[in-house]
Design a protein with these regions (language model features):
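Class I SAM-dependent methyltransferase SAM-binding "motif I" and its flanking Rossmann-like core
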Residues: 70-132
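A short acidic, often aromatic-flanked loop/helix-cap motif at beta-alpha or helix-coil junctions
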Residues: 31-41, 117-120, 174-177
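General beta-strand structural signal in soluble alpha/beta enzymes
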Residues: 61, 86-91, 142, 168
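Short, surface-exposed amphipathic charged segments that create phosphate/polyanion-binding patches used
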Residues: 36-48, 125-129, 178-188
Length: 196
């Protein structure tokens, strides 16, 4: 639904090669969205039938970049396995925008996805990531849904050491995006987080 709406807007500026109604738009199964598709359990080969017949296909994402912090790696992996050429194209990717805006190490970083929702497990994972960052200098990137931002921020402020630097970036692909990078000591005095 969102893809069709987007392509309709694109078509108003630049004509599509085919009428919108002629395009076959398929969504990855819900299970792939919930559990990810990096495990290799999802067989994406049937989605590539048109490409095997010589047609161009695309893989899109509603927010971010397919296969990077979003589902899609199974489709890309299947394309490689089937000998289909893969060309990655991107617009603004919030992870890289956040890293570039943070003032943290952009030469060595890791994206660790979502942290656990259960408070004790989340605090344990935060301590592990902080230890890794302090030991290696590697920036640790993670994401959270807006409705869990307050709980995440509370865990971070309570768990991290006072001198640890934390950058919180939100809505960076929007016109009113924000990024704030402070030590935990400073965050404890002003812990407000944007809800973009």
């Amino acid at each position: 639904k969102t893809t069709r709406a987007y392509l309709k807007r694109v078509n108003e500026v630049v004509a599509l090669c085919q009428p919108l109604q002629a395009l076959n738009i398929t969504e990855l199964p819900r299970e792939v969205h919930k559990k990810g598709d990096h495990t290799g359990n999802f067989d994406a080969r049937p989605l590539l039938a048109a490409a095997l017949q010589g047609h161009d296909i695309g893989l899109g994402s509603e927010s971010g970049m397919p296969a990077v912090a979003d589902p899609g790696s199974s489709v890309v992996r299947a394309a490689h396995d089937l000998g289909i050429e893969v060309i990655a194209l991107t617009g603004p990717v919030s992870l890289l925008l956040a890293l570039a805006s943070s003032g943290l190490n952009g030469q060595s970083f890791a994206f660790v996805g979502y942290l656990p929702q259960e408070p004790n497990e989340r605090a344990k994972r935060i301590r592990e990531l902080e230890s890794l960052a302090l030991r290696t200098g590697q920036t640790q990137l993670f994401i959270e849904t807006p409705y869990r931002n307050a709980a995440m921020m509370q865990s971070l402020v309570q768990t991290l050491q006072p001198n640890t630097r934390l950058a919180v970036c939100s809505g960076l692909t929007l016109t009113r995006g924000v990024c704030r990078s402070e030590t935990i000591q400073n965050w404890r005095h002003q812990p407000a987080v944007a809800d973009n």
